[in-house]
Regions:
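Beta-lactamase-like hydrolase cores
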Residues: 93-131, 148-154, 187-195, 467-469
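Bacterial N-terminal signal peptides
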Residues: 77-88
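Active/ligand-binding-proximal structured segments within catalytic/core domains
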Residues: 131-144
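Short hydrophobic targeting helices and cationic amphipathic motifs
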Residues: 8, 17, 22, 40-42, ...
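Short, low-complexity intrinsically disordered segments enriched in A/P/G/S/L with frequent Arg
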Residues: 24-27, 33-36, 41-47, 60, ...
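Low-acidity, Ser/Thr- and Arg-rich intrinsically disordered low-complexity segments
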Residues: 3-17, 22-29, 35, 48
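Conserved serine DD-peptidase/penicillin-binding transpeptidase domain
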Residues: 97-99, 146-379
Length: 471
């Protein structure tokens, strides 16, 4: 039973054997007194009580020879009642403090907190489906980890055809960034040293269906609206600023290509970030232009142009396969930390393509996620229309999200950590959510889900109260 440390110290100094000797003795048939005792065991802030039948001792008498009277049974009962009442007090206090938190949960909100055994210690509206916002990323990450494996690495393949065209085929790697492309170009410059000059740089983005439309994604310049594709670089965004010398890249590792400057000028922005779209194949063409820049920086030459095309499996020769330097588990760490919508849906679509077959589509990814919910979570009622939580059409209950957390427990270390808490937050207009784990002193975990679908509410104050109450 949980017990306050100051009272534990006082209890540990008490002699219950002596008290029970005077209060709870009973006469034995041999004319001796059998002395039952209550033993207290203190361990990690908890008290347990055991009763020993005791050994026989000689009946004691006063100096005048009179014997002690036998104790009244009600005295023993009274003492036990007082003890049990004291021991139950902290448990009742914690339960009351948790129950008081229900006042923060409105009709459009939900909360569920369970212990390591799955028993609810706090719940309200837990079976009502809510908009999860970005805590849905936990579910999508779990689906990808289940089907692809935590050490899965996204490939990108490079081919050479008989016309000296260099071809690149993408498979959805969300972390093809400038630093990676620079390293790839160093390898290819060595491998293709005898094949210079090259003709065209051909880009194959057929592993994902194009264009991909994600519910909730708009055509804004915000990074969270970056579209998806199988051959994308730098999250389909470029950061820039305007100086006295003109527009420059805000990231020294990434050049500001003429292809990009034209789009920046059209935006009218002086600084910030632009997002490429599916319009006029911007996404894949930007990837090709960036690869070309780093190839030429390593001394490679192209006589032709950057264009879209396809790999010919019969005639084209695979010369290099780059497997992502980041495992899927490492990608999940980054997407949960930065709440990256682009990366999350890349995982969902790539998982669908891997399991069902290319081309990858959002529908295939959603199908795989739904299959996981049915087969692993034994739940057919999760509504998912995309993987990141940006769509307001996603729906999941606190009970269902708690099931996700139960399965995600082996991966809890991939989440952001703050003290005893491992967590993911979510935010949309009028939506504030938080889900994760609270680690106990004994190493076990509470699982919690908080979903506010009421405008103006935040989960911050509530989680602080939970952390204070829960051991």
């Amino acid at each position: 039973v949980p017990f306050p440390s100051n009272i534990l110290e006082a209890i540990s100094k008490m002699s219950f054997s002596h008290a029970m000797d005077r209060v709870a003795s009973t006469r034995s048939s041999a004319g001796t007194l059998a002395r039952p005792t209550l033993n207290l065991h203190l361990d990690r802030g908890r008290v347990s009580i055991t009763k020993n039948s005791g050994s026989n001792i000689q009946n004691r008498s006063d100096s005048n020879g009179s014997q002690h009277p036998e104790p009244k049974p009600f005295i023993l009962i009274l003492l036990l009642a007082v003890l049990l009442g004291l021991l139950a007090f902290p448990v009742g206090l914690q339960a009351q403090e948790l129950a008081d938190l229900k006042r923060f949960i409105g009709k459009n909100d939900s909360i569920l907190v369970t212990d390591a055994n799955g028993q609810a210690v706090l719940e309200k509206n837990a079976d009502k489906k809510r908009m999860p916002a970005s805590i849905l990323k936990i579910f999508t990450s779990l689906v990808a980890l289940h089907y692809l494996g935590d050490d899965y690495r996204f490939p990108t393949e490079f081919y050479l055809d008989d016309q000296s065209n260099l071809k690149i085929k993408g498979y959805g790697d969300p972390l093809l960034i400038s630093e990676v492309i620079s390293k790839i170009s160093q390898v290819l410059a060595v491998l293709l040293k005898s094949s210079q000059p090259l003709n065209d740089l051909v880009l194959d983005d057929s592993y994902f269906q194009q264009p991909l439309t994600i519910p909730g994604i708009t055509s804004s310049t915000q990074p969270y609206d970056a579209p998806n594709g199988s051959l994308c670089v730098n999250f389909n965004t470029v950061s820039f600023k305007l100086t006295s010398q003109g527009y420059v890249s805000a990231e020294p590792q990434t050049p500001l290509l003429p292809f990009v400057i034209k789009k920046i000028k059209a935006s009218g922005l002086k600084q910030g970030r632009i997002v490429f779209s599916h319009s006029q194949n911007e996404i894949v063409l930007y990837a090709g232009k960036l690869f070309q820049y780093f190839f030429e920086k390593q001394g490679m030459h192209f006589k032709g142009k950057v264009k879209l095309g396809r790999i010919n499996d019969n005639n084209d020769r695979l010369i290099f396969r780059y497997d992502s330097s980041s495992s899927l588990a490492q990608i999940v760490v980054k997407l949960l930390e930065h709440s990256n919508n682009f990366t999350t849906n890349q995982l969902l679509i790539a998982t669908g393509a891997k399991i069902i077959g290319p081309p990858g589509t959002l529908a295939k990814g959603v199908t795989i996620a739904s299959d996981y919910a049915k087969e692993i979570l034994n739940n057919e009622d999760i509504t998912i229309v995309e993987g990141s939580g940006i769509s307001r059409d996603n729906r999941i209950s606190a009970v269902q999200m708690n099931q996700v957390l139960q399965e995600f427990l082996p991966y809890h270390h991939l989440m952001r950590r703050q003290g005893r808490e491992f967590y993911k937050t979510g935010t949309l207009y009028g939506v504030s959510t938080r889900a994760g784990y609270i680690k106990r002193s004994n190493g076990e975990f509470y699982r919690y889900v908080i979903m506010f679908n009421t405008p103006g509410k935040s989960t911050n104050a509530l989680i602080l109260r939970l952390l204070r109450i829960l051991d």
